[in-house]
Regions:
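Acidic/glycine-rich phosphate/pyrophosphate-binding loops and surrounding catalytic core
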Residues: 1-56, 60-67, 71, 83-88, ...
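Short secondary-structure boundary segments
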Residues: 76, 99, 120-121
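Active-site loop ensemble at the mouth of alpha/beta enzyme cores that anchors a bound cofactor
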Residues: 132-140
């Protein structure tokens, strides 16, 4: 990634709490108020760690902002919805665009003003280089 000019804003599961929609559902925190309650619970359990919360619609954004999560992951949103999320957020949280993120789509999404773009295509759709090695013994 770094060789290609990309950088990571997360290194592992230890450096930030990531609350996905399925986590909320499994914890019984789905539905209205679930984002607020899940962020509150995470902060009590792991004080000092930043929190990222996933949303999949603009309707969830006000609650995510109210939770004061440092990062909000915009999952599988249209480019227009991402641009609206940037406007609504107004720098109150960092926004990460994710889901259905092809390499061709990245410039369009970057133009929305999101802070981060994650793309699984960098790992699951990479084209490997055709590299070979010949071993030559000295003196032959």
């Amino acid at each position: 990634m770094a060789v290609g000019g990309a950088s990571n804003h997360r290194i592992g599961l230890y450096d930030r709490i990531m609350i996905k929609d399925n986590h909320r559902e499994l914890a019984g925190l789905g539905g209205t108020g679930g984002i607020l309650r899940s962020v509150e619970r995470a902060r009590k359990m792991y004080p000092g760690l930043e929190v990222e919360v996933e949303i999949d619609s603009l309707a969830e954004l006000p609650e995510a902002l109210e939770s004061k999560a440092e990062y909000i992951l915009l999952d599988n949103m249209s480019t227009a919805d991402m641009a609206e999320a940037v406007r609504m957020t107004n720098h109150r949280a960092k926004l990460e665009a994710s889901g259905n993120m092809t390499l061709a789509r990245i410039p369009e999404v970057a133009a929305t003003g999101v802070d981060y773009i994650s793309s699984g295509a960098l790992t699951h759709s990479v084209k490997s280089a055709d590299i070979s090695m010949d071993i030559i013994q000295p003196g032959k």
